[in-house]
Amino acid sequence: MGIIAALVVAAFIVYPKVQASQRAQAESNNIATIQAGVKALYTSASSFTGLTNTVAVQAKIFPDNMLSGSGTAAKPINAFKGNVTLAAAATGPSSATGSSFTITYDNVPAAECVKIVTAAAGNFYTTKVGSKVVKAADGTLDVAATAAACNNATSNTLVFTSI
C-alpha cells in the first residue's frame, strides 16, 4: 500500500513538470513557425512596415491551434491564454522604421519562460523578458539573466525581435 501511495504522490509531482516541458516545446515551435511565416511573407518587401496581427491572421502565419475565434475576428493566443502580438519595429541594425519585427508573448509562467527563451532566442536579433534584455543584438543569450528575469515574476512577457 505504501508503494502505491508513493507512486501516486510521485505522479502528482512529475506530471506538471512534464506538462510544462511539453507546453514550452510547443510554444518554441510556434514562435519559430511565426518568425518563418513573417519572413516568407515579407521576402519581397523592403521592410516589415504594416505588419499587424490582422495581416498575419489573413496570411495564415499563425498555427491554427493558436487562434481564438475565426475569420477576421480570430485572435492569436498562446498555450497560457496570453496574447501573441506581431508588430513592425525600428530596432534593426539601421534603426529604420520596419527594419525589424517583434513577436510578443504575454502571460508566460515562470516554469515555461526559461525553456521557451533558451529554445527560441538563438534565432532572434534580440530577446527580452519583461524589460530585461537577455540577448542583445548580435550577442549570445545570457542564461543566468534569463533565469533571474523569468523567476522574478509569476507571469512574464517575452519579446523576440527579428530582422
Residue ranges and their predicted role:
Residues 1-23, 27-30:
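N-terminal single-pass transmembrane signal-anchor helix
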Residues 18, 31-48:
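N-terminal alpha-helical signal peptides/signal-anchor transmembrane segments
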Residues 43-163:
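Periplasmic/extracellular, small/polar-rich flexible segments of pilin-like filament-forming proteins
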Residues 9, 17, 36, 115-118:
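Generic detector of well-ordered secondary structure
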